[in-house]
Amino acid sequence: GIIPQISVILGPCAGGACYSPAITDFIFMTEKTSQMFITGPGVVKAVTAETVSPEGLGGAGVHSTKSGVSHFVCKDDKETLEAVRNLLSYLPQSNLEKPPVAEKSKAVDKSKEIEEIVPDNFKKGYDVREVIATFADKESFLEIQKDFARNVVIGFARMDGNVVGIVANQPNFIAGSLDVDASDKASRFVRFCDCFNIPILTLEDVPGYMPGTKQEHNGIIRHGAKAKGASFLIGDSGIS
């Protein structure tokens, strides 16, 4: 974590070339034109007899909803580059600097209060994004991996112009329980924020780790430990 690293995939990316973007901090992909896969459809068919299209194997939709490889998906190249520029506005140039402060931050959206959003009945769900809107500068929340592991919401926001990282359980999706994917998603983001001096705000509303054979067999102990370990990194720069 010396400098933030961003990969922009604007076309097919196959074989060993996939590993380089995979070790960077953020990956952008475009709809219909971006693909990432270790072996292409031809090799897959020859080895496994499975027929699959490039898009179905490693398109933007696959990596933004199933694999979690992609962090942002945009409609075209122009929108992608604009999104990269927007992300950079939240990040420091290196681990020796603090995140940039916005000179003109928009006032907090006070159309709803937290009491109106969070129900008294703990069995009822709500959208945690609405809670974030009650304290973050208006339109400042930049959600990351919004379609992957939707039981956890992560992203950058500004509070009085200052950048913060937000990690929040999403009660609207499987009650905000932590599973393998959510643990990976949250822990990776926390580690990034820790590397680049970004304070973390955690919104906790979680019944626990998701039970069941699927989660146990997929390694919930191993992946869940990542989330637990990452929480120890927050230290004095975090609020829960």
Which residues make up each language-model segment?
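Ligand-binding clefts of soluble mixed alpha/beta catalytic domains
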Residues: G1-S240
